[in-house]
């Protein structure tokens, strides 16, 4: 009876060690991202608003054309991140 108890305790210890080591290995393979895609998109939008403003002496149509081109280009290059 004592031998069986020791064997069960040893088996449980081995399983516990195996479970603890596999959890550590699984977490090591998945580093946490430093920024999310939403944060990157927000930063890009803020940057384009800063640089996308109308310049002095520029007509409203030219400004609108530049903003539209910027928006379309941004959509084209960020489309793959959303699919």
From Swiss-Prot:
Is the Secreted keyword given for this protein?
A: yes
User: Which residues are listed as membrane-spanning?
Assistant: none
- Please list the residues that carry the modification Sulfotyrosine: 75, 77
PTM info? Sulfation is important for activity and for the binding to a putative membrane receptor.
One Gene Ontology cellular component annotation? extracellular region
Q: What does this protein do?
A: Promotes plant cell differentiation, organogenesis and somatic embryogenesis as well as cell proliferation.
Its protein name is Phytosulfokines 4
